[in-house]
Design a protein with these regions (language model features):
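Helical scaffold of the NTase/Pol beta-like nucleotidyltransferase catalytic core
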Residues: 12-24, 29-114
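Charge-rich, low-complexity amphipathic helices
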Residues: 70-71, 125-126, 172
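Short, glycine/charge-rich beta-strand/loop segments that flank catalytic centers
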Residues: 83, 112-124, 161-170
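Conserved catalytic core of two-metal-ion nucleotidyltransferases
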Residues: 88, 92, 96-98, 151-183
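Extreme N-terminal basic, low-complexity initiation segments
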Residues: 2-6
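Active-site nucleotide-donor binding segment shared across nucleotidyl transfer reactions
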Residues: 97-148
Length: 183
């Protein structure tokens, strides 16, 4: 069971709020505790005004409540959010496969990070984990090769590729013409 933090100075930043803790429990546990947490959460919020972190959990909530046979008018809205997440993730995963394939064909090792790693490694369902972009780690000695390969493909960056600057940053944002991002 997730508990909210008493550290009020961080609520909304690094610790879960009481509402987020209720939602996380509703999305992750099974049986009556899950249903109870969901009812408490649903009765204490306005669905149109949930915070971003909570909104990202709604697809996982939908899957958990569906597995438990919950019927409620809000289930259709949760389903719509789940389906949108699944669709967006399909597009991002296709883009990810393309980039990883291109880098692999040039003997550049990659490691998936964050959401894409979670989806591939832990979730069987691409709709339960919301992603806005995907993240790939490459060997530091191949960074310039990666930048050149990406620049010759559909991906571009606004980042200055000055060697001295690259040493002091943890990532570079790339974007395609469709507005899809990856770091």
């Amino acid at each position: 069971t997730v508990r909210s933090s008493n550290r009020m100075e961080c609520v909304g930043e690094c610790w879960t709020s009481p509402h987020q803790a209720m939602l996380l429990n509703a999305a992750r546990v099974n049986g009556e505790p899950s249903i109870s947490h969901w009812r408490q959460w649903a009765n204490s919020i306005e669905l149109d005004n949930v915070d971003t972190a909570s909104h990202r959990l709604l697809p996982l909530l939908y899957r958990n409540l569906t597995r438990q046979g919950v019927e409620h008018p809000d289930m259709d809205r949760y389903k719509g959010i789940y389906r949108r997440t699944w669709y967006r993730n399909q597009i991002l995963m296709h883009k990810l496969q393309s980039v990883v394939g291109m880098l692999g064909s040039h003997q550049i090792d990659t490691m998936l990070l964050k959401g894409s790693a979670m989806i591939v490694g832990y979730y069987a369902d691409h709709g339960v984990r919301s992603m806005n972009d995907f993240d790939i780690l490459v060997p530091v000695h191949q960074v310039h090769d990666v930048i050149n390969l990406l620049a010759s493909s559909e991906w571009h960056t606004e980042f200055p590729t000055v060697a001295s600057r690259i040493r002091f940053t943890h990532s570079m944002l790339f974007q395609d013409a469709g507005g899809h991002d990856f770091d």
